[in-house]
Amino acid sequence: MIRLSLPRWLRRLAWLLLALVVVALGILLGRAFEARGKPELMPWHRLVLAAEVHADSLPAQARWADYLAREQRLFDELRSALAAAPVSGRLRYEVDSHIGPAAAARDWNRSFESTPPAPRGGVLLLHGLTDAPYSVRGLATLYEQAGFAVIAPRLPGHGTIPSGLLDVRWQDWRAVVALAMRELRARVGPDRPLHILGYSNGGALALDYTLDALDADGDALPRPQQLVLVSPMIGLRPYAGLSRWLPLFGGIEYFEKSRWLDILPEFNPFKYNSFPVNGAVQSYLLTTRLQARLLALASSGRNQRLPPILGFQSVLDGTVSSHAVVHSLFEMLPANGSALVLFDINRASLLADMFKVDAANALDVLHDDRPQTYRVDVLGNADPATLALVERRYDAGARDAVVRPLQLAFPPEVYSLSHVALPFACDDPLYGMEPRMDEDFGIRLGTLRLRGERGALVVAADQFSRLGCNPFHAYLRERIAQTLPPPPASGAGAAPSP
């Protein structure tokens, strides 16, 4: 018998790799046991809705009407499934719940659309991860008033139950984006502008689609002429990539909770609180692909074909990487009229001296005095002694700022904006600090003022204290309006708003 003698270094390497695998499996198994201590899974964490759309079940010649018909079947199935597994209680999905739209009201968990008689353009609005089309409905009115056709699709896995994100893939979202853009082009005609507005994960999808459209032949994928990105998900925290391994043992019923990062009560009518690992994994796969494509585009010089991008980003963002928005997106852009609005922290807040060093220096990390190919607008305190707001504008190629006072101010209790705050006005009936009363969804998250002993709730206190609306929403709308074509001259027959 011939015996193979491996070099000593190779044997040591093999043993080291084996040891690392054993340690990794031990850590994942320990995490699976730890996950068993999470709250109990409910029907909305386990149900599988067969009518949900996936890319491989969407025919190549599918139309927008087909998607809406499939969505109707999905919500019919959802109602039947929840009725067959009733759970007593007052929260969302529970039998005594009043959380959600009234029976006769529009369900903002579903896709919505509007088309005026003579559209001046079209806009696709893409919501974020765990969200629903509700998160872009406020900004949709801006485009409707400008005579634009509007389509806001419900992306697969969203708007129904949290388990919808257990098996969704980012390719499913991409397929629906392409379908909706083709419908939008058909509605507005070949010579009208198309815009895409993406919030959070929707921002990543907007960019990914745009890159696909640049590479597509002919009119297979209509190209947008303008992108608006609100808190765009360009990059995630480094540990997000490791999360794909967390549910390794999740296929075993005993460890099924390891498929979830959060298992929480559902009290938001238009957003999931519970969050499966797969949702984070799909966003990570999408954003890593996107960053690589943007870098390759800039390196080849083909970034000149990109449309102008208007971005809005809080310097403090607990969901996405603000650093990636600047360095992986905007620094990859040509001089094409793009602009980035940064919302600074409130340096006149009573809490200003309590900021962590990283938070206090967040703006300096994102913006310095180097000339850029894009315009930068920093919204912040006029000085550290006042709540009054100014815009510091750095034009493309400029080192010095042009300062413009604004008729805006930080609310005294707000020390910063947040990832989730930007698209919502402060009179939003769900998230607003001063909500309109013309709509009632059974809860007003923006006005909750909870007090009690710490550690008593299964929901972390910061979920209620996180700012959910934008005190500077009027500025955001004004800047978006500047990307729209000017209204027709008097007497030219402007298209009426739907």
For each of these PLM feature ranges, what is it?
Residues 197-206:
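Gly/Ala-rich beta-loop-alpha elbow adjacent to hydrolase catalytic centers
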Residues 138, 208-212:
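Active-site signature of alpha/beta-hydrolase-fold catalytic machinery across serine-
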Residues 113-116, 271-456, 470-478, 482-488:
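Serine-hydrolase catalytic core
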Residues 102-158:
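Short, surface-exposed "cap/lid" segments of acyl-processing enzymes
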Residues 227-239, 345:
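Active-site nucleophile loop of the alpha/beta-hydrolase fold
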Residues 2-122, 222, 406-415, 424, ...:
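Flexible, membrane-associating and regulatory peripheral segments of lipid-active enzymes
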Residues 161-193:
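Catalytic nucleophile-loop/oxyanion-hole region of alpha/beta-hydrolase
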Residues 196-198, 230, 312:
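Short beta-strand immediately N-terminal to the catalytic nucleophile in serine-hydrolase-like folds
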